[in-house]
A protein has these predicted regions:
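Pyridoxal 5′-phosphate
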Residues: 1-173
């Protein structure tokens, strides 16, 4: 992380969110390569575009291998906030019998706001509340919120609000 060599950041701890995180040298190098050699529409029939497409395909293969999922299930977008907004807009047209979304109060507005705003489109928003003593989410509490009308449960893997890592596998069962 080259930024931490600068005098303003040297010897500092940085606990910012993903949108404000500093990039590693490897990411900076790849971005520099992209901006200087392949900043074109990928997959077009000329060398720079072909190389851009190959680089995108390689990144999908690497990520799919890390996550142990098919590369066809991975989609890149400009930011988590924009991706969530796009997904929320698509959900607006979803099955009318599945109009309930569960969000937590363990998250911040950037993660729950897109879902909460769907209430204006007729969705029911249920809040899965943390234990006020521990900051943890209880799967027992979640089970009381679940029914056949639930379309989505949105929760953080790690909450930077209460410094808690949620048991994702247990929650998703």
């Amino acid at each position: 992380f080259p930024a931490f060599n600068s005098p303003d950041l040297k010897s500092q701890c940085f606990f910012e969110n993903a949108g404000g995180s500093y990039a590693s040298k490897q990411v900076i190098d790849k971005l520099m390569q992209f901006y200087t050699h392949h900043k074109v529409q990928p997959y077009s029939p000329f060398p720079a575009a072909e190389k851009a497409g190959i680089a995108m395909d390689k990144s999908l293969e690497l990520i799919s291998g890390m996550l142990n999922v098919a590369s066809s299930t991975i989609h890149f977008g400009p930011s988590t906030s924009q991706n969530s907004y796009t997904l929320a807009q698509a959900l607006r047209e979803s099955n009318p019998s599945k109009r309930t979304i569960i969000v937590t109060n363990q998250d911040h507005e950037a993660n729950t706001g897109v879902w909460r705003r769907l209430e204006k489109s007729g969705f029911v928003i249920r809040e899965w509340r943390v234990n006020p003593e521990t900051g943890a989410l209880s799967t027992d509490d979640l089970n009381t919120l679940l029914d056949d009308t639930v379309n989505l449960v949105a929760f953080p893997h790690c909450s930077n609000i209460v410094a808690y890592e949620n048991p994702v596998v247990e929650i998703c069962r």
